[in-house]
Swiss-Prot record:
The gene is Setd3. Residues 571-584 have a biased composition (Acidic residues). Residues 94-314 form the SET domain. This is Actin-histidine N-methyltransferase. Its EC number is 2.1.1.85. The SET domain specifically recognizes and binds actin, suggesting that it does not accommodate substrates diverging from actin. One of its GO terms (molecular function) is histone H3K36 methyltransferase activity. The lineage of its organism: Eukaryota, Metazoa, Chordata, Craniata, Vertebrata. Phosphorylated by GSK3B, which is required for recognition by the SCF(FBXW7) complex and subsequent degradation. It comes from Rattus norvegicus (Rat). GO terms for biological process: actin modification; bioluminescence; peptidyl-histidine methylation; positive regulation of muscle cell differentiation; positive regulation of transcription by RNA polymerase II; regulation of uterine smooth muscle contraction. The keyword S-adenosyl-L-methionine applies. Signal peptide: none annotated.
Amino acid sequence: MGKKSRVKTQKSGTGATATVSPKEILNLTSELLQKCSSPAPGPGKEWEEYTQIRALVEKIRKKQKGLSVTFDGKREDYFPDLMKWASENGASVEGFEMVNFKEEGFGLRATRDIKAEELFLWVPRKLLMTVESAKNSILGPLYSQDRILQAMGNIALAFHLLCERASPNSFWQPYIQTLPSEYDTPLYFEEEEVRCLQSTQAIHDVFSQYKNTARQYAYFYKVIQTHPHANKLPLKDSFTYEDYRWAVSSVMTRQNQIPTEDGSRVTLALIPLWDMCNHTNGLITTGYNLEDDRCECVALQDFQAGDQIYIFYGTRSNAEFVIHSGFFFDNNSHDRVKIKLGVSKSDRLYAMKAEVLARAGIPTSSVFALHFTEPPISAQLLAFLRVFCMTEEELKEHLLGDSAIDRIFTLGNSEFPVSWDNEVKLWTFLEDRASLLLKTYKTTIEEDKTVLKNPDLSVRATMAIKLRLGEKEILEKAVKSAAMNREYYRKHMEERAPLPRYEESDLGLLEGGVGDSRLPLVLRKLEEEAGVQESLSLTETVSKVKAAENGLVNGESLIPNGTRSENESLSPEESENTTGDTEESSGSMDAVKERL
């Protein structure tokens, strides 16, 4: 994506002339693998571990300096070749051009008026780099033997990209030459830029991403040097950390899901041309047309000639955008922060609370979200907080009697409080919890705003501080919202106002009979109405998808974080509705299994 590629462009033709002993690097990578495979550090020790791993990585990078495969010239020099290649192979190339938009980097600009919902871009399967094409490439023999490559499609795609980049006659060279040489993902942050994220919620994922990427590189360096099926790979004589970091970032910022050719499963893919579109708020307008076997995109809105063409990547928080896509999106209507809550097993009423939560399809301990938009909490979190704050008598009312099931159904509905006292308690609790989270930051909102005025601040440091500031602003907003609700319900309690009562016909949420198995669906229905996207299983997600014209579908990611096994099959219903999701579905390399 353009926004992810503001940094310098790829520069040189083949590997460089520096010499370093493979055995020397093998020893260093063995040390790195051991360090990255050690147990997770204790509280407060994560930064120390990060700096130790980073020191080893930097030592390896220094030894390998000049060994990476790169390209001559700037990436934009290759745009004409990309358009010619795409056109010759059946992609649409009319109506737009690739342009540098300064702050957002490269993107697509309309060269004619494009109407909302007009099909303006399509890319056939043959142009896509997929896990399937990786299996059929020079990587195939190693793929067939390595369980990590088989289980983690994103890693297989990264190696596919590296092998094709190192092959001058690769079919995908016109595409690969237009990819940026560096990214703004945290893997490229300087240590001081990472330090800007200290005390944020995102820092733990940043540490994990860096550690797992280092571990993967160390593991695969040994594989490439020693595995008999790696002998013919063009990486045998030159596989640097810089190469792997680039491939990892290329994939995590660009990968998407598409159905396999027979439509029975989903696979990961890189989609040339389409992946030049930058993000804005809206709806997903990209899907996969199985009949024509191509990725298709309709216009999100009316675009006039000269306008930048945007698409919607999905409901990602800014932490996800920064960590996995390498950019911060201002005014992100889907921004949120995590809040971990659970019912203590030492709670005298634990068993009763656990049972009520189970009937509502909610775990006794989970990570919820506080949202940038109103309301700040989802129906699921509201239901959890209500149960969390219930008295013994209130719990009995939700477990026993003819109206118990009906009460469960309205747990996530803000219009029907359990009691005024319960509402006061839950909003007081949320206010206190958000206030405590705010106090964990080392800087204030005002201090962050002052730092952002510094004209010498790097792009990556700016992203980090904006992310830090955004987290605090969401928490501060939650505190204010909770305080307002607390006082609202306290007033009702003092006035002894009658509780709103519902009629069975008001629910309108049941499909068929009443039963405990339907309860989670009610909360999910409320989530939809509130505009809140909670994580659902693959089947549940597909069932929500509505087919649109041109075989396109607007839907959520079918593979959370792109880490589902490539061997997992889809049901016929899922196969019919599977789409190529936008960048919102981009997964990260830090999802690699712990055994790596």
